[in-house]
Amino acid sequence: MVFLDPTEISFPDPEFFDSENGLLAVGGDLSPDRLQFAYETGLFPWFNPGEEILWWCPDPRFVLFLEDLKISKSMKKVLRDEVFTFSENTCFRTVMEECRNAYRKDQDGTWISSELIDSFVELHKRGSAKSIEVWQNDELVGGFYGMQIGKVFCGESMFAKVSNASKAALIYFVKNHPELEMIDCQIHSEHLESMGATMISKKNYLTILKKQA
């Protein structure tokens, strides 16, 4: 594990630095420039409130290749019935705040701090961070946000206030962004596995990511 200098934007190269649980570095800050560099390098922040910032690059990595997307019969009906409408990048900060407040069985979203939100909003203004919004009767009921690095979208967090909203968001995003090659889902979830996400080695992940430079 490497302890980062908050005055210098650098990370250990994950290609040559291994750890048993994927934790590569501690410390630094959550500035927009550091976050941008982290995602370009293959790392992402994930930590508990009050702790130092932890930077991860797990091996294996959980990803969704767009051609592997699975849409269940029930979801096809939801989409066919136009239960939801969708938008992109219309309320980025609100999507992050909803992700922070969302209930999660195995974790909470409180690591999405106000500082992190402010930095991501700046990255959104720069065009790197993006959001997908799901609406029902003019109410925001689901969505997600993340960072786009070339043809790789690094999904950060999602929320759903009604059934199927987050699944619909992902399907919409994949269908409307054929230019993408892969969605980085970071760590395993049954929800995303059911939609086609799979594990690949860190080496393969970094190979794909480096092609985006």
How should each PLM-predicted stretch be described?
Residues 1-213:
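N-acyltransferase acceptor-side catalytic subdomain
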